[in-house]
């Protein structure tokens, strides 16, 4: 069996792919996968198949499908259900679009997406629980239970990143949308302010990512020979606007690894402005004057987080087949910061 185990996002999904060997006899796919996938039960695979998350040669199959040589199998597994209950919290939401199948929300910086790692309250999912509970009594829409693992988040963004997020409201929508993320047929662009200026106007960063062995809370680019479990990642970037010592860039994700843009931009020498985890909270470029230092400190105070915004999101609607595209304007803190840099004159800070 030729296999490629890939974890696109260790908070939400385990994504697995293999090609069945030539000598393989016909066998139920749930049994075949349980024998070849580590720490995965047959019942878990059956659950994935029931949700439409097991595909052979691009088509969803049932758990009783019999594999044959040459079959290309893809599996998308939810992580095991969490042992806590998400209770409704009245947290304001900026809902960009909603129908019976899905919801697109514009997440503010500072809001954790889902519980975990010490954050078990005041998350986006708690806000969604409130929204769905109260919406059902006002609008003629079915009740959505955010604790149902077959619905919910399709992807995520970091706590201090703002911008667009997609939520599935039915199991069918989640399976369809998850497959689009798995196949990289979604469109996602981010706007980021980074340290330094560029000689080129665009480029591509390719570098496999895994946790840093010296600090498990951050990621780094690895050589695959040195760290075989690192996950390949590709980021395309282009310059939107250059300032004297920082640059506004657009990043387009080909893959969706944790901290991908933040790690990749640091890797090429351009950490995100005010990104504490990846070295962007230091004065990396510019003048050695007290006035300039004060200017940067004022900038940090104006937007005290990594300057990263999930600007656009494109995908195919899981029920209608319509191609949908959403654009989110910068939040107030990022807008104010960019305006400050546009007004900056180096000779006034000598």
Please place each PLM-identified region on the residue numbering.
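RNA pseudouridine synthases
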Residues: 1-350
């Amino acid at each position: 069996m030729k296999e490629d185990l890939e974890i696109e996002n260790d908070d939400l999904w385990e994504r697995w792919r293999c090609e069945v060997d030539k000598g393989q006899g016909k066998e139920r796919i749930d049994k075949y996968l349980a024998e070849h996938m580590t720490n995965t039960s047959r019942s878990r695979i059956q659950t994935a198949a029931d949700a439409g998350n097991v595909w052979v040669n691009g088509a969803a199959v049932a758990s009783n499908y019999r594999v044959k040589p040459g079959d290309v199998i893809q599996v998308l597994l939810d992580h095991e259900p969490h042992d806590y209950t998400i209770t409704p919290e009245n947290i304001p939401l900026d809902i960009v679009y909603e129908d019976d199948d899905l919801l697109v929300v514009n997440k503010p910086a500072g809001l954790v997406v889902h519980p975990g790692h010490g954050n078990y309250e005041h998350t986006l999912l708690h806000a969604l629980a409130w929204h769905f509970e109260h919406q059902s009594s006002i609008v003629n829409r079915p009740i959505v239970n955010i604790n149902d693992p077959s619905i919910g988040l399709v992807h995520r963004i970091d706590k201090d990143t703002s911008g667009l997020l997609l939520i599935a409201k039915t199991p069918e929508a989640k399976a369809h949308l998850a497959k689009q993320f798995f196949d990289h047929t979604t469109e996602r662009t981010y706007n980021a302010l980074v340290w330094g200026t560029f000689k080129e106007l665009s480029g591509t960063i390719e570098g496999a990512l895994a946790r840093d062995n010296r600090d498990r809370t951050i990621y780094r680019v690895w050589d695959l020979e040195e760290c075989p479990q690192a996950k390949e990642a590709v980021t395309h970037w282009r310059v939107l606007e250059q300032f004297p010592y920082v640059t506004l860039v657009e990043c387009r994700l080909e893959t969706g690894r944790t901290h991908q843009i933040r790690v990749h931009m640091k890797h090429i020498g351009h950490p995100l402005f005010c990104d504490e985890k990846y070295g962007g909270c230091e004065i990396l470029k510019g003048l050695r004057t007290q006035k300039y230092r004060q200017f940067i400190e004022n900038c940090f105070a104006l937007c005290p987080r990594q300057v990263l915004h999930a600007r656009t999101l494109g995908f195919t609607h899981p029920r209608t087949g319509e191609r949908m595209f959403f654009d989110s304007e910068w939040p107030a803190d990022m807008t104010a910061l960019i305006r400050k840099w546009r007004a900056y004159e180096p000779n006034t800070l000598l």
